[in-house]
């Protein structure tokens, strides 16, 4: 393809609104353009990258016998009302009415749609297991879209759904999809980790995230420095062995703390380490007031709390509501004397304390020497891990310390179980002739997000550096002067030879200075650049490998074989 015919509007300056490297370069190199906050047009170069990503995905889906199909982006609200997500998904769900005053949504994901399809079409276990998928635009009304393609209101996603007659079928589908995702991300040339993830609004019992380490990543990944353990910070666990309190129980005492509002203030006043104090944080979980207690040196992990309660929503309680229910405001809360209507959850580290201090549920007052089951009834079923791990904590396997890094979520796989099939009536007759709920899995890849993830990991100070597997073109032929007959001849000859070998070639036939051409070539990041210059009359050209920025002079007759080898080396 001739570059003069390509819509590739490169920019000389980085737009001010672009905060991260991938956003800056995709704008500057003419890959994307914003049309509204969180909504982008994909220009020809970006569309070619997307096409190649989608091809790799389709090839790996074919290997596990997944069926590609397509369902509407606009969905009747009734399905989501039946599943319960119409209300619980939150303000990110686009809702609207048609001219007949019927409620509709723009799909952020399609569990309900595919489940209803299977409920209508599959009646016997003999038709299972089955995996279906689509590649399609999704919509999420993000409160604050940012970082280019990393957090948008419209995005492209591959979403797959497996349907099995039993748990073994789900486990096999989950394993097959995990292997397929590994193959996909390997072929894309990405560095990534498979980590323990949170199912979130999807529901389900088990999930695994695929995270690409990158400075622009909004997720914090906790990983062991000695083993392969890694988890999203929301789900990460540290190593802790429960122990029974053996200290002699001291007399409960209430003390005045009028100026101590934080755990640090109280620790200083009492001359106690923070791990001998507890903090009590109030939440509202599905309209129920919940008090969560942790030791003073840890923060409450809201995701763990919400998952433990199986709550559709969990938000921090308003201080006015807390004061009305408990009789005190923030800074003076504790587990002693809580009203019966307040559910008490206690982190396991806090549950093992004796003679500890906490707020007295009275402004400006604290208790010291609190002991469980003397001063506060503690139910074993309300004790669990409700804390957020810290960097340097011992990993859950006990073999390494936790380190933190930033990551971009590029894929997520879930074991949904019967969360949707039970609600939407997706049942089959089993081998005993009994009706049984279909067991489901859900599997997503952020296709458009992958553009940014690859750009974040592969770019350098000069521009983008695409792996050959997804580059918009394989080869960039750059004649210095198209008016020079030898250069024009060699450029055309090379294009013909390389295209005949099945390579995709971009020829810079523009009437621009050499410096402009080279800068644009580095910026758009094709794997191989062939410069046709002053030695064209000798049939000699310069081949540059973009990933390593190495230059090799060679004869035209050597180019095809050499470039094939170099491209294979540029796959990652």
Swiss-Prot record:
PROSITE patterns attached to this UniProt entry: AA_TRNA_LIGASE_II (PS50862)
Gene3D superfamilies assigned: Anticodon-binding domain, Bira Bifunctional Protein, Domain 2
Keywords, ordered alphabetically: Aminoacyl-tRNA synthetase, ATP-binding, Cytoplasm, Ligase, Nucleotide-binding, Protein biosynthesis
Source organism superkingdom: Bacteria
Comment text on domains: Consists of three domains: the N-terminal catalytic domain, the editing domain and the C-terminal anticodon-binding domain.
Role played: Catalyzes the attachment of proline to tRNA(Pro) in a two-step reaction: proline is first activated by ATP to form Pro-AMP and then transferred to the acceptor end of tRNA(Pro). As ProRS can inadvertently accommodate and process non-cognate amino acids such as alanine and cysteine, to avoid such errors it has two additional distinct editing activities against alanine. One activity is designated as 'pretransfer' editing and involves the tRNA(Pro)-independent hydrolysis of activated Ala-AMP.
Principal subcellular localization: cytoplasm
Protein name per its UniProtKB record: Proline--tRNA ligase
UniProt key word ATP-binding: yes
Entry's Gene Ontology cellular component terms: cytosol
Keyword Transcription regulation set for record: no
UniProt subunit comment: Homodimer.
HAMAP family documented for this protein: Pro_tRNA_synth_type1
InterPro entries: aa-tRNA-synt_IIb (IPR002314), aa-tRNA-synth_II (IPR006195), aa-tRNA-synth_II/BPL/LPL (IPR045864), Anticodon-bd (IPR004154), Anticodon-bd_dom_sf (IPR036621), Pro-tRNA-ligase_IIa (IPR002316), Pro-tRNA-synth_IIa_bac-type (IPR004500), Pro-tRNA-Synthase_IIa_type1 (IPR023717)
Intracellular or extracellular location(s): Cytoplasm
SUPFAM superfamilies attached to this UniProt entry: Class II aaRS ABD-related, Class II aaRS and biotin synthetases, YbaK/ProRS associated domain
Source species of the chain: Leuconostoc mesenteroides subsp. mesenteroides (strain ATCC 8293 / DSM 20343 / BCRC 11652 / CCM 1803 / JCM 6124 / NCDO 523 / NBRC 100496 / NCIMB 8023 / NCTC 12954 / NRRL B-1118 / 37Y)
